């Protein structure tokens, strides 16, 4: 690998989806970072980086705050892609319309595309305009249910590697359907057909990571059959995802509340896949019911 090789991350996505937290996270990881970089200036900036011995891990926030963003972004990406000394990935941050509206109300800011002041109209227009960019992004992170701390951890897990070569990582996560589907999931599996530990009083307040809950969930005949088929489905297709250049494959397993069944299954799957692949395990909603009770 040449000393002049640059590892570039373009951070973009919906307004209000967390790009400020993201770029701060990259700075913490040792990246050279710039927020609100006009697309037309990116190629020239990268030329300057190539001519110096400065940090060659670079993260740039490029978004619609630049007035010419939608006119310039495609030609900018083409220019970057044609440079053999640059490895670049796109991180697209997203969130549901409802969550973005809530964040705008909280900050009392107006949406830059909401000409008549209606935030939701601006969000919908922005989502439509950004759809092509989202489809070409190697990393799509749904921040709807993420705290800033969780977003920072997600970015650290995906971008802290020292190598300039994009890696293939499997994100195995559990979630509760009652709290919404994870928008960044590539594969979603439903385990609500399994017996629910919630109705066992001694297991209700525990999670699928507790041994007695885990054993309860995984010992049922239906669990054994489904888990076998799950592995037989997922394992053979992993090399194909890797071959297509996908950096992160997110496998989401859901139950009603995301506390028992999905947690046990996700944990079991993560351990199985980790023997041959780089795997990160997370449980989005396992403590959500407890937090709700504590707030009441």
Curated annotation (Swiss-Prot):
Single GO term (MF): GTP binding
Annotated binding of GTP, by residue: 63-66
Residue numbers binding ATP: 13-20
Record has Methyltransferase as a keyword: no
Sorted UniProt keywords: ATP-binding, GTP-binding, Nucleotide-binding
SUPFAM superfamilies, A to Z: P-loop containing nucleoside triphosphate hydrolases
Transmembrane residue ranges: none
Gene3D superfamilies: P-loop containing nucleotide triphosphate hydrolases
Residue ranges of coiled coil: none
Record's function text: Displays ATPase and GTPase activities.
Family: Belongs to the RapZ-like family.
The protein's name in its UniProt record: Nucleotide-binding protein MGAS2096_Spy0550
């Amino acid at each position: 690998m040449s000393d002049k090789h640059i590892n570039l991350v373009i951070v973009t996505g919906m307004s209000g989806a967390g790009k400020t937290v993201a770029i701060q996270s990259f700075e913490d990881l040792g990246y050279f970072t710039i927020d609100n970089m006009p697309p037309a200036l990116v190629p020239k900036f990268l030329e300057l980086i190539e001519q110096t011995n400065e940090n060659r891990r670079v993260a740039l926030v490029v978004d619609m705050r630049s007035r010419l963003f939608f006119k310039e972004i495609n030609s900018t990406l083409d220019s970057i892609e044609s440079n053999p000394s640059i490895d670049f990935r796109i991180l697209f941050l997203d969130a549901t319309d409802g969550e973005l509206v809530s964040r705008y109300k909280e900050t009392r800011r107006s949406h830059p595309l909401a000409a008549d002041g209606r935030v939701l109209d601006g969000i919908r227009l922005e989502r439509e305009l950004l759809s092509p960019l989202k489809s070409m992004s190697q990393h799509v992170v749904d921040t709807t249910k993420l705290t800033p701390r969780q977003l920072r951890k997600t970015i650290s897990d995906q971008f802290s590697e020292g190598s300039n070569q994009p890696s293939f990582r499997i994100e195995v996560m559990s979630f509760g359907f009652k709290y919404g589907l994870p928008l960044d999931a590539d594969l979603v599996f439903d385990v609500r057909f399994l017996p629910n530990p919630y109705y066992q009083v001694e297991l209700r307040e525990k999670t699928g990571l507790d041994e007695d809950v885990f054993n309860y969930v995984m010992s049922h005949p239906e669990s054994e059959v489904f888990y076998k088929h799950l592995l037989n489905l997922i394992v053979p297709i992993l090399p194909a995802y890797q071959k297509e250049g996908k950096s992160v494959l997110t496998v989401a397993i859901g139950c009603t509340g995301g506390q028992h069944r999905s947690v046990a299954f996700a944990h079991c799957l993560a351990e199985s896949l980790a023997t041959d692949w780089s795997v990160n395990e997370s449980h989005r909603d396992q403590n959500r019911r407890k937090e709700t009770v504590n707030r009441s």
